[in-house]
Structures are given as structure tokens and as C-alpha cells.
Amino acid sequence: MEEQEGTLPQKADFSGWYNDILWRAEIMDVRYPVKGLYVWFPFGFGIRKRVYGILRELLDRDHEETLFPLLIPEPEFMKEAEHIKGFENEVYWVTHGGTTPLDIKLALRPTSETAIYPMYALWVRSHADLPIKVYQIVNTFRYETKHTRPLIRLREITSFKEAHTVHATWEDAERQVEDAIARYREFYDRLNIPVLISKRPDWDKFPGADYTIAVDTIMPDGRTLQIGTVHHLGDHFSKTFSIQYEDTKGQQQYCHQTCYGISERSIAALISMHGDDRGLMLPPEVAPVQIVIVPVIMKKREEEIMQAAELLEKELQNAGYRVKIDTRDLRPGAKYYYWEMRGVPLRLEIGPRDLDNGVVMGVLRSGGKESLPRADIIAEVNRKMTEFTAILQERAKTHIKDHLVMVKEESLVNEMVSKGVVAVHWCGNRECADRLEEIADASVLGTEVRTDLIDQTPGTCIICKKPESVVTLIGRSY
């Protein structure tokens, strides 16, 4: 790729920066000839593989991975009216097999409840069969009519992790919701992405759910991005699909269920939260290349320098690091540009003077050079990686703090929401919420906010002045 054609827009121009970095850093190619469908570059897919590796690790503690079909028969898909009402305008339908019209239309899954739950009705017989905890990572299809954007708003979601659990009681399902929230918080902690967790208002919950807990983060332009959801489904779907078990008294009972999902929006958040004007900045755990070694060649000592670089590479690889030596016939500056764009956490430079002094020059992607003793290189690299991770964490935390503000005057809501997420007191009345959304030109995101960044003490509703109103988040969203 000609990644050096022009320069990356400054991150202050977030839309331009985001669109450019996807191809300059070789994450996604947007030129596929169907709107809303994109192609993963190998480097971008390497990030995806490691991000979803963390997710698999967290879920595999007590979930089992599975795979259900992409195609859903229309009669099964249409069974749950409230659920389908939320998706019917977004469904792709398969109507022909070759040139032959199908007797029954088949939906390309927009989500998998109606594919999975008919099978659960066959699998569950007794209380001994419970709980069921499975997940799959699949592609889903939604006919988005809004403006599509890679990783954020797609017609093919290529990396949808959806978990579906079945329990004996509502309370068991509620405990599973809390477990899923904790799992997602741990996932985003490892990506160094601070999150805001809240309960969506009833009119914005998942179709067919008792309630929805959402995981949001704040993008560089102050808009929120929903990067995870957890839904308590109650016995709504089990009644529709006849998912029942025999309890210890021999009575038939309907099951209670949960589902929770994360998509490649997690990677959009990763890119956006940590990147800067020079490109990506990737946490070491998910960087396809963690360390790049750049030999600084002097012709008379080229062989000696290359041998030293190869020995260094092998030593670092044996310590568990993903390492590349850049041997391309390019100026050092061009190599630095290339690897900085791709967010490699640490660059090690080794030249004749470094050889003579028994050191390696270390440069973190966040900036700053340091001479590292060659004899202690593994310990030194470990230290630098820890330092880099701490820098990412602190920068991200500062960003969220700077874009989350408590507002107590109605007249200030619109001005402040243009800069980020606003916390207000809201009585829970839909009319007050509608008024809030009107004056803010934004959405009510949720209540029961789980963050220590704002005071959660109840107060007076910002609209109707009712006392003992709860803290609620307002924001403009992708």
C-alpha cells in the first residue's frame, strides 16, 4: 500500500482521521462493491484475532462455544412478535434456491434468538439440564438504511459474539446478567478502554427483554459508542418457543434466559480511544507486532549489526514477544512512519554505536527514547511494556473524565452535550425524557449508572423538579 500518500488527518478531525486510519494502518478495505460490507486486511484481522482471543478466554471459563446456522426459517423467525418488530425492516431474505422459489423464505440472521431457541426447546427437559451457557462468534446481517461506517454501523457484522444462557429462575438469570457485566468490564479493562455501564430506558431495551444493560464508551468527538449489551429475557422467549423443564417436584416450569453480545465495535473503540495524529497505538496484548527491531546499518559493519538484530529477535521471541526485524531497503524514517502508523508498542534501534556501548535504543509508541542495557534486555522490555500500558490507561481515563459532566440547569444541557456525555437527574417519566431529548438533541442513554466518575446521589429532576430523581446519562450516539 502507498500509505505515505499524503498525511493522516489530525485526530481533532475525527471523522476524517478514522476513515483514513482504517486503510493507512491496513485494518479494513472499504472498497468492496456492496454498501456496508468491508474486507479485513491481514494486519487488521490480526488485531481482531487477539481481541476476540481475550473474549474467548473469559467466556471459556464456564461457557461452551457452539455454532448455529445462518439461515432461519420464516415461521420460526416470525414467532416472537415483539422481538421481530425490532428487526423486521432490517432483515435480508433468501427467496430462491438457484432459480427455484423456496416454499419457505429464509432469513439471514440479524441476531440468533430465533435460530437457537427452537433447539433449546429440544435440549431442555429437566432441571438437571440447566443452566445452559453457550456462545458463538459469527457474522450477522442487517439492512442498515442509515449511513454505514466500517466497524461501527455495518450491513454485515463480521464478528458478532453472542452468548445465550438458560436458567431455572428469574433470579438465576439476573445473577448471570451480573456475571456477564463483570466479564465485559474485565474485557475492556484489558483493552484499556474505560466504559460507562447503565440500564437502558424501557423504550430502548432489546425487543423482548425484561431489561437491557448497555456498555458505552465515549469517542474522541464526544459521541457515545455502544460496545456491548446484556439482556435479561425473563421467560418471554421460553414461552414463545416452549423451553420448559421439570422441576424437583415434577412440575413443568418455563425457563428464564439471558443473552449478551459484543461486536467489532470493540475494535472501533480500541482504535479510536488510543490512536493519535501519527496512527494507531495498540495495547501490547492485542498488537500483532509488539516489538519492531530497526537495524541502523553502517556498510562496513552491516553483517555484524544484522547478526546482533537477529540474536535480539530470537531472544525476545523466546521470551514470548511478537517481534519483527525491518530489513527493507528504506530510510529509517520511512520505517519509523510505517510501524508507528500500525501502533507497534516498542521500537528497538540497534546500530554500530549501540553495539559498541552494549545498549539498544528503545522508543515507545507514545514517545520518548531510552537507552536500554543489552545484557538486561528482557527485563527492560518488560518494564517498557508496563510503562506503555499505564500511559494508555491514564490517557483513556483522562479522556472519559474530560467528556463526562454533571449538569443541573436545563439551559446548559444542549451546550454541554455537544462536548460529550451529560449526567442529569431524571424522574423516570417518559414526558420528561422526551423533553430532555428535544432540548439536548440527544438520547437518554440509561440509569443505574455504574461509574465512580460522577456523584450518584439522587436529586431534583432537571425538567419537572421532582425530588429523589436518579442520575441519568444523556448523549449523542453512533
UniProtKB/Swiss-Prot annotation:
Keywords: Aminoacyl-tRNA synthetase, ATP-binding, Cytoplasm, Ligase, Nucleotide-binding, Protein biosynthesis. It catalyses: tRNA(Pro) + L-proline + ATP = L-prolyl-tRNA(Pro) + AMP + diphosphate. GO terms for cellular component: aminoacyl-tRNA synthetase multienzyme complex; cytoplasm. It is found in: Cytoplasm. GO terms for molecular function: ATP binding; proline-tRNA ligase activity. InterPro entries: aa-tRNA-synt_IIb, aa-tRNA-synth_II, aa-tRNA-synth_II/BPL/LPL, Anticodon-bd, Anticodon-bd_dom_sf, Pro-tRNA-ligase_IIa, Pro-tRNA-ligase_IIa_arc-type, Pro-tRNA_ligase_II_C. The keyword Aminoacyl-tRNA synthetase applies. Its EC number is 6.1.1.15. GO terms for biological process: prolyl-tRNA aminoacylation. Belongs to the class-II aminoacyl-tRNA synthetase family. ProS type 3 subfamily. Consists of three domains: the N-terminal catalytic domain, the anticodon-binding domain and the C-terminal extension. Homodimer. Catalyzes the attachment of proline to tRNA(Pro) in a two-step reaction: proline is first activated by ATP to form Pro-AMP and then transferred to the acceptor end of tRNA(Pro). NCBIfam families: proS_fam_I. HAMAP family: Pro_tRNA_synth_type3. This is Proline--tRNA ligase. It comes from Methanospirillum hungatei JF-1 (strain ATCC 27890 / DSM 864 / NBRC 100397 / JF-1).
